[in-house]
Amino acid sequence: MASVSTNEFKGGLKFMLDNEPCAIIDNEYVKPGKGQAFNRVKLRKLLSGKVLEKTFKSGESFELADVVDVELGYLYNDGEFYHFMNNETFEQIAADVKAVADSAKWLVENDVCTLTLWNDNPITVTPPNFVEIEVTETDPGLKGDTQGTGGKPATLATGAVVRVPLFIAIGEVVKVDTRTGEYVGRVK
């Protein structure tokens, strides 16, 4: 298995720490006036999702994580597993609820999602940055009600609740940013 030195650390690099794959979020190289240089690293453990800050001596070596990101189309949820399919080979992969986690509210059939596989098992599911989902429940916007934020909560077909403008009605399709959970626009 290939190894990587702390001198080669950069954002997005995936390596093994305590027998668990981790991804670097941010890396800062520090060379004090006296003493050995070191790296101050902010990283995310891919299995648990925890974000940590660690300090490593300059020149330390770590094993690269055997982690692969693949793009697969979302098919359906059978209650226990979320099923995805490779649109070229038609190979199907099932991800458990733990791997999907908070992404479940943004999964729309046939949307292409990014699955992170470790030892051929999905450990995280990332939905597309923007999804288009139908509004299934929202209060009617009252004419002239412009006081306050000018928005109202709307429940989407996937169960997610998003704050939308007053003019959005039930049955309309809205575009939502999955990274922030915010309304982006109405789909024509």
UniProtKB/Swiss-Prot annotation:
Major location (coarse): cytoplasm
Subcellular location: Cytoplasm
N6-(3,6-diaminohexanoyl)-5-hydroxylysine carried by residues: K34
Free-text description of this protein's post-translational modifications in UniProt: May be beta-lysylated on the epsilon-amino group of Lys-34 by the combined action of EpmA and EpmB, and then hydroxylated on the C5 position of the same residue by EpmC (if this protein is present). Lysylation is critical for the stimulatory effect of EF-P on peptide-bond formation. The lysylation moiety may extend toward the peptidyltransferase center and stabilize the terminal 3-CCA end of the tRNA. Hydroxylation of the C5 position on Lys-34 may allow additional potential stabilizing hydrogen-bond interactions with the P-tRNA.
GO molecular function terms noted in the UniProt entry: translation elongation factor activity
Entries under Gene3D superfamilies matching the protein: 2.30.30.30, Nucleic acid-binding proteins
UniProt pathway annotation: Protein biosynthesis; polypeptide chain elongation
InterPro entries hit by this protein: Elong-fact-P_C, NA-bd_OB-fold, Rib_uL2_dom2, Transl_elong_fac_P/YeiP, Transl_elong_KOW-like, Transl_elong_P/YeiP_cen, Transl_elong_P/YeiP_CS, Transl_elongation_fac_P
GO terms, biological process: peptide biosynthetic process
GO cellular component: cytoplasm
Domain of life: Bacteria
Keyword Cytoplasm assigned: yes
UniProt keyword list: Cytoplasm, Elongation factor, Hydroxylation, Protein biosynthesis
Pfam families reported for this sequence: EFP, EFP_N, Elong-fact-P_C
Protein family (similarity comment): Belongs to the elongation factor P family.
Function: Involved in peptide bond synthesis. Alleviates ribosome stalling that occurs when 3 or more consecutive Pro residues or the sequence PPG is present in a protein, possibly by augmenting the peptidyl transferase activity of the ribosome. Modification of Lys-34 is required for alleviation.
HAMAP family, A to Z: EF_P
Protein name (record): Elongation factor P
